[in-house]
């Protein structure tokens, strides 16, 4: 019967898992190593058949010169279009032919180029990534085609006010600073970019000492290092001057932009803590209580569940190396903007004025820890998170260490942070209506 089948299957399953785990027993926990040319390598073993690896470069939109706005993202697109030994078609097919995936994204402070593949194809993925990161040629004919693709991307983005407003809000609070720039750039400037402009940008930033190579997968660390030394022996160490200019003093602003949309879109927020600030974890927890992804967030309960005024309301936190952004967003009927703004301000005031009880705080911590745990069930996100953390902090924190930091937060710290971040005179507002 079914029980016998289950029992007969069990020993084989156990032995497979045991063999895998035995192969990795000496490797549990992450490993790191620095090559002679300055490239930092980090590896986290996993029991999955799928592995991830890639390069995270410490260069993003904020590192562009005035006349190269959009260049970091432009380079991220063009890096797949040709190297000294491969045409675009060969790059495209190299991982696709074995069912793998090549991907990349650009942020304000980093660019990440990575691949997902069955573990047995690690060598193929690493060799291809090393080729495109260090030996791209940016063919002019490919630039002309890709410029059109990026302009289409910009136009589709501009048709989505609920996304566009986030960029416009950063432009408002970092006025005149590269951090306020749109990652995609602007079409007029993009059309002026040439092959040598892309090469100039990569020659400033795409060097081993300014990036990390990350691997998440069932691989031996020695094997990774051996291959790295073989593939990257010819890549020289170059000192990169990437000292960033911090944004000037913050002045809260209020701005209304007239848009031809059915819905009004509203952002309320301010500058937040930078990535190295000890209070960042407390603000992270406050943000989750206020407008995190849970349906029981205070803003969702007040604006949507009780009153049906909005479809979407949320609050967000972004930390950069020398500053940050805290913001709340909602979309509503233009007639309801004032009511919704009043309700958001009321929730912010509650967090400033009322100390949380120990029961409320324990429940909030439990929810956040649970959400982080569920999110960590995705190895692609884990690999990218590890890359970003190692790039900026030169260390990798386990989930348990993050949970510990959350557990240490007291009601007093939350009250102090709420009064620093949510003070009414400190908030900026941007409205599309």
Task: Go through each PLM region and give its residues.
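N- or domain-start disorder-to-order transition segments that initiate the globular core
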Residues: 19-50
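Active/ligand-binding-proximal structured segments within catalytic/core domains
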Residues: 38, 45-95, 169, 206, ...
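Flexible, small-/acidic-enriched active-site or ligand-binding loops
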Residues: 252-254
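Short solvent-exposed loop/turn micro-motifs enriched in small/polar/acidic residues
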Residues: 24-27, 240, 248-250, 296
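Charge-rich, well-structured scaffold segments of protease-associated domains
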Residues: 18, 34, 90-246, 256-257, ...
